[in-house]
Swiss-Prot record:
Molecular-function annotations in GO: guanyl-nucleotide exchange factor activity
Protein name stated in the entry: Guanine nucleotide exchange protein smcr-8
Keyword annotations from UniProtKB, A to Z: Autophagy, Cytoplasm, Guanine-nucleotide releasing factor
Domain of life of the native organism: Eukaryota
Ranges for region Disordered: 288-310
Chief location category: cytoplasm
Keyword Cytoplasm in record: yes
Domain dDENN FLCN/SMCR8-type: 434-488
InterPro entries given in the database record: FLCN/SMCR8_DENN (IPR037521)
Residue span(s) of domain cDENN FLCN/SMCR8-type: 282-425
Entry keyword Transcription: no
GO biological process: autophagy
Primary role: Part of a complex that has guanine nucleotide exchange factor (GEF) activity and regulates autophagy.
Amino acid sequence: MISFEDFLLRPSKVVDPFNRFVAKIDPFLTLVEFCQVIGPKPLAVVSQRPDDKIRGVDINDMAIWLMSSDTVPGTMIVLENNQTGVYAAAYYFNLYDMRARAFQRNLCIAYLCSEKPTKETLNLFSSAMKKLVSPVLICNRRLFIRHVTDIVKFSDSVDETTLKQYYTLNGDSQKLSDGSRFNVVFEQTRLLKSKFLTKRFQEMAFDDDICCGHNAENMNEAEDIICSFRVPSIPLSPVETLTPCAYSSIIPKLRQLCSELCSSGSPNRNSTHGALFCGHRPIATTSPAATTTLPWNTDSGKSDNDKNGEETLKEVTGHLGDVIFPLLCGEDLVVCGAEQRKSTVEDMLGKLSRVVPRESARNVEENIKIEKDPNRIGNGLGGLLCNRNETGKLARWRNVLDMNRSALKTFTYDGSLLAGLNKKRKFPSDRSLVLFIIAYLTNICQLAFICRYMFIKSPNSIEKALGDQQKLSSDDERILINLLMGIDFEKFNQLKVSSKDGAKPSRTINL
């Protein structure tokens, strides 16, 4: 499918002779199963229209397209159908069934739309899938273990000699093979029991656990499952019988998720048409003509700590580039301080979080919690309460802003993009300094856009893309790559270099 951006920015690309511009479809969610008898088939469709009707797309063709991808259960991928112009964010998982091939039945939940899903949409879909599928999987695993345990117990009660005599006295040649077939089933079932009955599986639990446990023994059902192997033509059980406790909650959750995804992907939502944001302000937009619907609030760089008289950011104006460089290149940075300096640490965290480029304007308002346990600190920017003599807690971080000693532990920055932030300047307040940093990063994003469009002609390196116009150091290249990943993660993720590759020795800067 040819986009308008291809005509404007990529004139060297061959124009599609079939002119495959397609009509826009309404976004919808679908649950698809790869049936071992008839192939991919849709089990449920959820949309915003009455009766969940879908226009402009063949749901059966979409089911075949979704299940044709080579994936691993538990993964999410983004697909693009060039013929129909449909994008899909698909999450794949499997349910265990005693009668299925390899005891597994593959399923997929996908969100289909005409526009490429944004990062906000993908994050929402990914987090929702984990919450939605977890109770389904745990119920299915417990029921499957119940069947395996009952079948093993049933097989132990069957005397092999008696079984052979029974089929030997019977003259039907078809039944002579049932004994060996049952033995194969019993052997495979015992292997499954040793595989699943582990301590890790027994301790598996989720917050939204609605499964009854399936602890009651049911030998009649186990006998029916064993007898069903004699007739291979018997159809498989419906999917809802494989997870009886949680299947009824799938459709209501999908309906709620569909409305959330449609609102997050709507162009009239309360966010802005941008790719990267600092303090509610777009520093990089997806197209030059894109405008923002978010009001330019003059208090966007103002934090709650400003009212308390905290002006911590002004004290490090001579090393601002060294402070924010780890965050701009995707590294972790920990701001630490003692209990007496907790307000200072909170103020520094709040202001640094407003100058870190983010993929969504909503994420700017998220407050970063200060932890006492270093193991609870996540990736990116974090806060830690520790005394001056507890330096052992900071050993695993390469970048530490120590408010106790007014020192910065980091690796040497060798570049020119942030040179303007390492000059000693005077600002009337931290708020004005935050706005200055946002404007400074906006100019850097303009260079990132040049790299984005010239990367098409020279996809091996950003330095080659720029040619002789401007020489970039490896540190500046890391900054631009991280900004490009924020603009388009799928296209520029391949350029990311591991932090362990070419790691430089750290140094301590007295602020």
